[in-house]
Swiss-Prot record:
Name listed for the protein in its UniProt record: Small ribosomal subunit protein bS18
GO biological process: translation
This protein's record includes keyword rRNA-binding: yes
Family the entry assigns: Belongs to the bacterial ribosomal protein bS18 family.
Gene, per the UniProt record: rpsR
Organism: Rhizobium etli (strain ATCC 51251 / DSM 11541 / JCM 21823 / NBRC 15573 / CFN 42)
Keywords: Ribonucleoprotein, Ribosomal protein, RNA-binding, rRNA-binding
Function: Binds as a heterodimer with protein bS6 to the central domain of the 16S rRNA, where it helps stabilize the platform of the 30S subunit.
PANTHER family: 30S RIBOSOMAL PROTEIN S18, SMALL RIBOSOMAL SUBUNIT PROTEIN BS18M
Complex and partners: Part of the 30S ribosomal subunit. Forms a tight heterodimer with protein bS6.
Keyword Glycoprotein appears in the UniProt entry: no
HAMAP family linked: Ribosomal_bS18 (MF_00270)
Pfam family, one: Ribosomal_S18
Cellular component, GO annotation: cytosolic small ribosomal subunit
GO molecular function: small ribosomal subunit rRNA binding; structural constituent of ribosome
Length: 82
């Protein structure tokens, strides 16, 4: 007998598409003064986390990056974390 026929058959895994956390009726607004919200989208080293990880839409990712850069310029967020 062949060994391949005794192995269990795996079903393909269907990953559910994440929705953008900034779209919807009661979604938070992206504001450069809201440091607590912006820190959720910055890595522990201070880099902006990509949208493929955070599931933020392309339009909102650009707004988020602009708000983070503005907050960095004003000294509300660090550029790098040592």
């Amino acid at each position: 007998m062949s060994e391949a026929s005794s192995a269990p058959v795996r079903r393909p895994f269907h990953r559910r598409r994440k929705t953008c956390p900034f779209s919807g009726a009661n979604a938070p607004r992206i504001d450069y003064k809201d440091v607590r919200l912006l820190q959720r989208y910055i890595s522990e080293r201070g880099k902006i986390v990509p949208s493929r990880i955070t599931a933020v839409s392309q339009k909102k990712q650009r707004e988020l990056a602009q708000a983070i850069k503005r907050a960095r310029f004003l000294g509300l967020l660090p550029y790098v974390v040592a």
